């Protein structure tokens, strides 16, 4: 494997030696001379560093350090998603769990683009360190929060750090691997999920989050940064090694000659390069539309509140303003329409959106559903929630080797979507009661296989469709669509929950005070009313009713999910970091093979022509 993971280093070095000629062609190609050259130099630095990873020991070190970093991120995320439920429960606002999730996802939409674009300009490592600082700040604020608004504010900082570290870790692994082995490298940070599901439940039980959730979150302010140190030191060492090469010195000398512009020019460049106006418009728009859906419920008659209505209308207007800005004024639009017009780009992005939409709509309230309506312990519930990650992580090395052999991914994504349909059907059938244990486990296993076949495969397909200069941007857009799907999915599930659950609890319990407790603090409720009690049975029936609605919506959304998979292109995963030949405007030009619907249509035409000729 070692001889083919990164590709032919001699080709990379020869390309680097031609950098001066390319710069001369590009330096005056448009008004953004500073942006062109600075971005170009950072990408070339990555290519020189990539050549240093040709040695087997450095490849092993890269994968190992990514594993350690991924372990810190993944274990914290797994535990914190549970601790968030206990935090909202302590505020007696557990029903607003999805509101926190929506706020996280909305913030992610804008931050993904910022990280991806700045990483081309300032380098991956610098942005990785910035993301780590946000991560620590958010963790500290969340741990000290005494009310939901303060916890949500901490979630903004934490989520900026979380999505940044994930995105930049993906970009770092992509820079230093070939397309053929890209899947293997990217899954290295995911392998900790082989271990996490079996220890997270025990950790949660031992940590007693109902009383100690604040300290349980706070400890990650120093545990997580420790997990990032190995990969940070490795990149710094490889940068030191690269600085000793003639190519690096030549590139730095040329960079000093080409450096132009002062502070004002840099700020103007960043304003247009990041599309600050576009980011603000889409972030505020989504916040105005999605967050009120999880806040309004019939018990408080908030839908009759003029503030809720005005917020929704404002969000819709801002969204149309965003589209107009992107089409008419943005110099570097968040959604590069020319790039997105090719089905090799828009189809995988559609798959990404519906993949995360269906996941969040089905799993946003899965942990409380397991505890309240399926008689699972906190340990068992945590393991079931994390079972899909375990399945995907365990099978990922074998899947990555298969991908390296076949070098194609489209059929895998189609199979993953089909598995999602089966998974959602099982979640619909086994949505509550003592007989749901085995069915939910089966659904979780299939969900893991679906995630394995879809999620990272779509990232690699998109990276295979673009050049190195566009790789970070298109990866950032993919992450943005994933968070957009997550935001809307969490918002829809939250809206259904807040609109339906209170009435069902009032109806089945027949006691307004008891219904309020069951709705606002379900974990407290189940400790007072054991399994089999009439009150608990009434709550279980309410949960089953609401889950039926949520899973019906999720099952319906697998149809457009499957449709988008049919239109994807199927680029070959070559033994280089990206396709650089046969490109146009940063997009790889592939033979315009027909999508599967066109092929089916052609097949029916062929059959009809045969029948006519037979007559």
Curated annotation (Swiss-Prot):
Xref: Pfam families: MFS_1
GO CC field: cell periphery; endosome; plasma membrane; vacuolar membrane
Superkingdom classification of source: Eukaryota
GO biological process annotation, one example: glutathione transmembrane transport
Positions in the Cytoplasmic compartment: 1-58, 142-152, 238-275, 329-343, 405-407, 462-471, 570-615
Membrane spanning stretches: 59-79, 121-141, 153-173, 217-237, 276-296, 308-328, 344-364, 384-404, 408-428, 441-461, 472-492, 549-569
Induction behaviour: By iron depletion. Expressed at a very low level.
Compartments where found: Cell membrane; Vacuole membrane
Keywords from the named record: Antiport, Cell membrane, Ion transport, Membrane, Transmembrane, Transmembrane helix, Transport, Vacuole
Key word Membrane present: yes
Keyword set includes Transcription regulation: no
Bilayer topology term: Multi-pass membrane protein
Gene3D superfamilies documented for this protein: MFS general substrate transporter like domains (1.20.1250.20)
InterPro entries per the UniProt record, alphabetical: MFS, MFS_trans_sf
Molecular function in Gene Ontology: antiporter activity; proton transmembrane transporter activity; siderophore-iron transmembrane transporter activity
Extracellular-side segments: 80-120, 174-216, 297-307, 365-383, 429-440, 493-548
Role summary: Proton/glutathione antiporter that imports glutathione from the vacuole and exports it through the plasma membrane. Involved in resistance to oxidative stress and modulation of the PKA pathway.
UniProt family annotation: Belongs to the major facilitator superfamily.
Name of the protein in its database record: Glutathione exchanger 2
Species of the source: Saccharomyces cerevisiae (strain ATCC 204508 / S288c) (Baker's yeast)
């Amino acid at each position: 494997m070692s001889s083919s993971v990164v590709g032919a280093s001699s080709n990379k070095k020869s390309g680097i030696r031609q950098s001066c000629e390319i710069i001369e062609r590009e330096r005056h190609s448009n008004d953004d001379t500073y942006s062109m050259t600075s971005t170009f130099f950072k990408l070339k630095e990555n290519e020189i560093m990539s050549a240093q990873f040709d040695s087997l020991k450095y490849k092993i070190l890269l994968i190992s350090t990514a594993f350690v970093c991924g372990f810190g991120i993944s274990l914290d995320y797994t535990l914190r998603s549970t601790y968030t439920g206990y935090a909202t429960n302590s505020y007696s606002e557990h029903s607003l769990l999805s509101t926190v999730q929506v706020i996280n996802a909305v913030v992610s939409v804008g931050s993904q683009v910022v990280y991806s674009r700045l990483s081309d300009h300032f380098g991956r490592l610098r942005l990785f360190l910035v993301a780590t600082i946000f991560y620590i700040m958010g963790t500290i604020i969340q741990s000290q929060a005494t009310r939901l608004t303060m916890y949500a504010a901490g979630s903004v900082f934490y989520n900026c750090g979380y999505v940044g570290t994930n995105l930049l870790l993906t970009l770092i692994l992509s820079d230093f691997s070939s397309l053929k082995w890209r899947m293997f490298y990217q899954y290295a940070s995911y392998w900790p999920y082989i271990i996490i599901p079996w220890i997270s439940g025990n950790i949660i039980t031992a940590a007693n989050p109902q009383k100690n959730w604040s300290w349980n979150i706070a400890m990650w302010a120093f545990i997580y940064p420790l997990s990032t140190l190995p990969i940070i030191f490795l990149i710094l060492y490889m940068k030191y090694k690269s600085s000793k090469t003639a190519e690096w010195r030549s590139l730095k000398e040329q960079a000093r000659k080409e450096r132009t512009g002062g502070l004002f020019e840099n700020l103007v460049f960043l304003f247009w390069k990041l599309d600050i106006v576009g980011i603000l418009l889409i972030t505020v728009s989504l916040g105005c539309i999605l967050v009120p859906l999880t806040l309004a419920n019939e018990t408080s008659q908030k839908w009759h509140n003029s503030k809720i209505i005005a917020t929704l209308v404002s969000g819709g207007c801002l969204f149309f303003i965003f589209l107009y800005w992107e089409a008419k004024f943005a110099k570097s639009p968040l959604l590069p329409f020319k790039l997105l017009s090719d089905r090799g780009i828009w189809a995988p992005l559609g798959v990404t959106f519906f993949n995360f939409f269906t996941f969040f709509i089905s799993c946003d309230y899965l942990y409380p559903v397991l505890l309240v309506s399926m008689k699972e312990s906190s340990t068992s519930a945590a393991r079931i929630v994390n079972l899909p990650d375990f399945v995907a992580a365990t099978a990922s090395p074998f899947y990555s080797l298969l991908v390296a052999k076949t070098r194609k991914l489209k059929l895998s994504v189609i199979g993953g979507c089909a598995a999602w349909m089966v998974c959602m059907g099982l979640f619909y059938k086994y949505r509550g009661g003592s007989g749901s244990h085995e069915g939910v486990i089966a659904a979780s296993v299939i969900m893991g296989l679906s995630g394995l076949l879809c999620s990272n495969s779509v990232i690699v397909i998109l990276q295979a469709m673009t050049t190195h200069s566009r790789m970070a941007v298109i990866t950032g857009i993919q992450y943005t669509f994933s968070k957009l799907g997550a935001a809307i999915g969490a918002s829809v599930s939250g809206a259904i929950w807040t609109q339906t659950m209170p009435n069902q609890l009032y109806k089945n319990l027949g006691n307004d005070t008891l219904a309020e407790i069951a709705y606002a603090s379900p974990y407290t409720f189940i400790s007072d009313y054991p399994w089999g009690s009439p009150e608990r049975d009434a709550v279980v029936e309410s949960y089953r009713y609401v889950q039926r609605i949520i899973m019906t919506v999720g099952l319906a959304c697998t149809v457009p999910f499957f449709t988008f998979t049919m239109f994807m292109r199927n680029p070959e995963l070559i033994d280089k970091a990206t396709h650089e030949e046969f490109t146009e405007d940063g997009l790889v030009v592939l033979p315009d093979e027909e999508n599967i619907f066109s092929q089916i249509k052609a097949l029916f035409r062929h059959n009809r022509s045969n029948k006519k000729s037979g007559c």
